[in-house]
Amino acid sequence: MRYNFFLTLILSFCFVSVSAQNNNENNKFFSGFFNFNYQLKLDKIFLEVDKINEDFLYINSLTTGLGSNDIGLDRGQLGNERIVKFRKYGNKLLLVQPNQNFRAISNNASEVNSVEQAFANSVIFGFEIIEKKEDVYIIDFTPFLLQDTHGVIKRLKSLKQGAYKLDLSKSALELKRTKAFPNNVEFEALLTYVGNAEGRLISSIAPDPNNISVIQHHSFIKLPDNNYKSRNFDPRSGAIFTSFMDYASPVQDQINKKYIIRHRLKKINSDLDQSDVVEPIIYYLDPGAPEPIKSALMDGASWWNEAFEAIGFKNAFQVKILPDDADPMDCRYNVIQW
């Protein structure tokens, strides 16, 4: 009986620490698109998942690189861009990447379901549910961050630079650029790879080519609403397009759908040939850019406004200096980084 009492008491303290939403020397709470907290004593990040079966954007990237153009693992390099969602299975949450290549654009739920079942999805990661608070599930997010998502090991091996593996004892969460905003959350981790350097490229750039470290970045980003109107791709336009197979297409139509990638602009007054827009495209210039480069960037980027005005959108493309109180990692700001 006494054993059960103490066990219950210990578990209670564990749960309180995991789900704590206060900031102190042992806990740092982040509130945003996803809430999460960092526990210093455990050296872990616990994510609060309140969005089950809701799509969002997941992007991984490298904050720091290796410094070799030939290897191609560079500072700021984007990795994969994926539409993902959390799904609950028993006492697990799985981070699932639905198959966007094969779809059924239809109001017929059975038709949509048939196509979804015909093609494989990808489970990116699995998490044990540590605690449930109403409709919020708490998971240990740390192992997800401390993995080789960017594929550094595979890249080095393919270029015959050596066989490396991730050394977790020399890896750690990086809190400096781990942040939360209303529409996105950002995470970083320093990853150290150990192995026997075999290639000239890796040997020429790292202080110790048998131990190389990079900082890997992860972004979870809220998707916009469904009011965007897609536009068919015309090969004469020179536009960039995205494509997928639509199995709900009428038999006389092409099953391969192509839509251009474009900005979302809406006129305030659609009856006018020239009208201001509801929400302009605004790019913010890094205030750290020196002169005369800053002015050149401002003038060059602002030139695009002429192109938009030529097709009837007034003041649709704007360039401003990033405000002092704005964070360039907040996805509400499009930043031209110096």
Describe these PLM feature segments.
Residues 4-5, 47, 294:
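Alpha-helical interaction segments
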Residues 1-22:
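Bacterial Sec-dependent N-terminal signal peptides
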Residues 54, 288-316:
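Zn2+-dependent metallopeptidase catalytic core
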Residues 22-289, 298, 321-338:
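Auxiliary tRNA-acceptor-end handling modules of aminoacyl-tRNA synthetases
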